[in-house]
């Protein structure tokens, strides 16, 4: 697992989890704003993403275990956690399974929804286990020798724009320098083409929503108002009745799914207000 830090090593730790098909260096503008406020910001590339190794197994449970391993290796005791999209959902679910792993959780468009999220498309599982395992094995056979299509950095940036249409070309081009590699025949994104989100066994998004009222630590959710393909489609009015009374939910007008990239200073400001001074939570 490739890990990253911003800020002083002896500062109060703050764990940040990126979203699906992203990598930790997408935090290169956002994370320093948190570090400048006195936090030691810690993140990692999920398995198969960025500079972390490709794996034989990709599943929701594997990502959850990786989160716990990284946190326990880097931080002693509870700490605040921030997660975007899939990363937010991972933080929420891990905290529900292991209460007080975190002192509080911030989910940037990553709170549970009745709708299946697009970056965890196969997390909604209702079929029999035999069919699930067969499907997973078939996918591994199809993708065992797959490699990503090469191109120039400009071409890779344009391809990523299909997934991130609201983000500037300059930013997407920058990401090619930290999230892609140069081979003899061109540049390729480092993300494993065999990635498959989800896992085995039944799962419904509603189950996560039903567990929210008993969330064990302070919870802060941020949602944008502009829907896009990678967004989770969570509507604030649908979500509010399921939140704990102490939870905070901010709706950022005019922002899309990648709120912390579109508006890093505003997003960091809202989160820092929620967190308080380093060490208070």
Describe every region a protein language model picked out.
Residues 1-15, 36-39, 76-77, 112, ...:
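Alpha/beta-hydrolase fold catalytic core
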Residues 261-273:
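Post-His helix in hydrolase/transferase enzymes
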Residues 96, 104-149:
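Flexible "cap/lid" loop of the alpha/beta hydrolase fold
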Residues 146-227:
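Alpha/beta-hydrolase
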Residues 213-255:
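Conserved loop-alpha-helix segment in the C-terminal half of the alpha/beta-hydrolase fold
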Residues 252-264:
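Catalytic histidine-centered segment of alpha/beta-hydrolase-like enzymes
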């Amino acid at each position: 697992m490739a890990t990253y830090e911003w800020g002083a090593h002896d500062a109060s730790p703050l764990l940040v989890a990126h979203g699906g098909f992203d990598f930790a260096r997408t935090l290169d503008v956002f994370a320093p704003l948190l570090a400048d406020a006195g936090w030691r910001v810690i993140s990692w590339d999920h398995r198969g993403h960025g500079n972390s190794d490709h794996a034989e197994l990709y599943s929701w449970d594997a990502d959850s275990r990786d989160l716990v391993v990284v946190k326990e290796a880097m931080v002693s005791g509870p700490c605040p956690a921030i997660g975007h999209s899939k990363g937010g959902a991972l933080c929420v679910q891990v905290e529900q399974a292991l209460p007080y792993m975190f002192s509080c959780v911030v989910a940037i468009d990553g709170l549970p929804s009745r709708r299946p999220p697009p970056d965890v498309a196969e997390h909604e599982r209702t079929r029999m286990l035999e069919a699930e395992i067969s499907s997973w094995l078939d996918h591994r056979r199809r993708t065992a020798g797959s490699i990503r299509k090469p191109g120039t950095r400009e071409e890779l940036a344009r391809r990523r724009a299909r997934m991130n249409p609201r983000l500037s070309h300059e930013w997407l081009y920058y990401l090619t320098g930290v999230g892609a590699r140069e081979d003899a025949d061109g540049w390729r994104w480092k993300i494993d083409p065999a990635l498959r989100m989800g896992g085995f066994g039944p799962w419904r998004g509603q189950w996560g929503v039903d567990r929210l009222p008993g969330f064990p630590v302070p919870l802060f959710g941020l949602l944008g108002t502009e829907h896009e393909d990678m967004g989770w489609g969570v509507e604030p009015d649908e979500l509010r009745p399921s939140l704990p009374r102490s939870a905070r939910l901010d709706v950022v007008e005019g922002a899309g799914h990648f709120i912390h990239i579109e508006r890093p200073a505003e997003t960091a400001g809202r989160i820092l207000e929620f967190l308080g001074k380093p060490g208070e939570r």
